[in-house]
C-alpha cells in the first residue's frame, strides 16, 4: 500500500495560526504521517512512480494544489482542485471549531460532547467531499481524507 511519508504546508502567505489551530495542524500532520493510505492511480495508461510520497499542499490562484513527489525528489503528480466545493463545509467546520474551543473553557462535559459530535459530523462531510474531488487523481482512505481535510481548513482560512 502506498503512503505519504512527508507533508509540507505552503503557508508562507498566511497569518500565524492561533494556538488551537496550530495544535490541530500538528496533530493532523503527526497522525497522517503515522498512518495513511495514498495511492496514485495509473493515468492515461502511464505508470505512476510508487510511493512513499512527499506531499506539498498549497493554495494558488484560488485552487488547492497537491504537489506529489517520490522520496527521491522526482515529480509523481500534481493536481489542482477548485476550492468552491469545500467553501461551505470549511466555513461550517471553522465555526464549529470556534464554538468547541470556547465550550471546552466554559461549558459542562455534556454540552461539549454535543458540540464535538457536530464537529465530527462536519469533519466527516469535509473528508467525503475531498474523497470525491480526488477521484481519479488519488485514492485515500477515510482517516487520511479526514486528516488532509484538517490541513485544507488551515490553508483555506489562513491559519
Swiss-Prot record:
UniProtKB keywords: Plasmid
Q: Under which name does UniProt file this protein?
A: UPF0262 protein TM1040_3562
Q: Which organism is it from?
A: Ruegeria sp. (strain TM1040) (Silicibacter sp.)
Region Disordered, residue ranges? 1-21
Keyword Cell cycle appears in the UniProt entry: no
Origin: domain of life: Bacteria
The similarity annotation says: Belongs to the UPF0262 family.
Q: Which InterPro entries match?
A: UCP032146
* Protein's UniProt keywords contain Magnesium: no
Note one Pfam family from the annotation: UPF0262
S-S pairs? none
